[in-house]
C-alpha cells in the first residue's frame, strides 16, 4: 500500500510493508487512515505477542479499535487525553476478544503517529518503534522500548494484554514536523534485522520510499526470523 495525500500546505507520502518472514503466520497488523478533509493522517502498527496464543487476534483488535476511535473523533484535536481514551477502547476490545475465546491470554504492542497540520503525535506501548528523522539533523526521536531483562530474556513490560489494562500505558510525544522529515513505524522484526546506523542511513537515502522499504525487505528476509511490518512516511 502506498500513496500521497495533502494535509493543509503539506503533502504526505507513505508506503507500507507487512510480511510473515520465517514464521508460520503473521501476527502483525497495521492500518493507515487518510483524512485530508479533516487535515489529518494516521498510521498504526501492532505486533501480536508470539509467546501467547492468538497474537494475531490481539494485534487486529487493538489496531482496529484505535483506528476506529481516531476516525470517529476527527473533530477532536490530537492530545495526550485522546491517545489515552483510544487506548482504553483498545483494552476493552482485547478483553472482549479474550472473553469470546474462553478467556484466552493474548497480547500485542502498538505504535502510532497522528499528523494534524504540522503537528505529529507519536504514541507507543511495548517494543514496536517510531523513528523521526530530518535530513539536516539526522535522528530527532526514537521511541524507548518498554522491555526489561529477566534471567537474560527480554520481556515486554508494557503492552495491551487481556484483562491487564494497567500495563497498557502509552508514552506520548508531540513534535512540529517540517518538509523533508521522514517517519518510520515498525515492529521489532524489522529493526532487529539490521544495525541501527544502517536503518537510519537508509531512511535518509535520496530515493523513493518504496525503494527504501525494498532494502528493508531484503535485509529482513536475509537476516530476520520474525514477522516484519513498517509504515514509512515522508512530509513533502
Which residues are covered by each model-predicted region?
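PP2C/PPM-type serine/threonine phosphatase catalytic domain
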Residues: 1-236
